[in-house]
């Protein structure tokens, strides 16, 4: 066993430790970039947020995994947006406290299949930066002699 551990230690010294195994190891740029681009990625989705009308039930688990668009775009005026979607089923347990029952069932969730960086909608970042109180009205030019 000691010989095996020594061989593994020598191998790691020659080839380097696998990524993420040693605290402080730096992830190479291309790997960082590949993980950060706009793409479908596994996301936890709350069942009650997807089905807000089901508040009288308890779900187990309370959230499920689904692929949703996420990641960075090359410009702040763009956002990662779904360009393709599909419906997927997830088996969950529905508990009805008022009836004292529980049953397994399949619920449908939207999953993103394709993503693309597209211009932000009117409610995006740019409009948030310049949002005004409706009572303020339109901005007016101020002149020193008025």
UniProtKB/Swiss-Prot annotation:
Any one GO CC term of the record: extracellular space
InterPro entries: Cystine-knot_cytokine, PD_growth_factor_CS, PDGF/VEGF_dom, PDGF/VEGF_growth_factor
Superkingdom assignment: Eukaryota
Any one GO BP annotation for this protein: positive regulation of mast cell chemotaxis
Signal peptide: 1-24
Amino acid composition bias (Basic and acidic residues), ranges on this chain: 133-146
Modified residues (Pyrrolidone carboxylic acid): 25
Function according to Swiss-Prot or TrEMBL: Snake venom VEGFs that may contribute to venom dispersion and prey subjugation by inducing vascular permeability and hypotension. This protein induces an increase in capillary permeability after intradermal injection, as well as a drastic hypotensive effect after intravenous injection. The hypotension is mediated by nitric oxide (NO), which is produced by VEGF-activated endothelium NO synthase. Also induces angiogenesis in vitro. Like other crotalid VEGFs, this protein interacts with VEGF receptor-1 (FLT1) with a high affinity, whereas it binds to VEGF receptor-2 (KDR) with a low affinity.
Record family assignment: Belongs to the PDGF/VEGF growth factor family. Snake venom VEGF subfamily.
Protein name, UniProt field: Snake venom vascular endothelial growth factor toxin
Taxonomic classification: Eukaryota, Metazoa, Chordata, Craniata, Vertebrata
């Amino acid at each position: 066993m000691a010989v095996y551990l020594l061989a593994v230690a020598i191998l790691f010294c020659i080839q380097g430790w696998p990524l993420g195994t040693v605290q402080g190891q730096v992830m190479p740029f291309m790997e960082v970039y590949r993980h950060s681009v706009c793409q479908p990625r596994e996301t936890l989705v709350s069942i009650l947020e997807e089905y807000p009308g089901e508040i009288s039930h308890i779900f187990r688990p309370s959230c499920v995994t689904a692929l949703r668009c996420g990641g960075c775009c090359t410009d702040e005026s763009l956002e990662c947006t779904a360009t393709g979607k599909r419906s997927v089923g997830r088996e969950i347990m529905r508990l009805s406290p008022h009836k004292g029952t529980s049953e397994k069932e399949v619920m449908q969730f939207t999953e993103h299949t394709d993503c693309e960086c597209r211009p932000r909608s009117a409610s995006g970042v740019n409009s948030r930066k310049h949002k005004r109180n409706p009572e303020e009205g339109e901005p007016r030019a101020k002149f020193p002699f008025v």
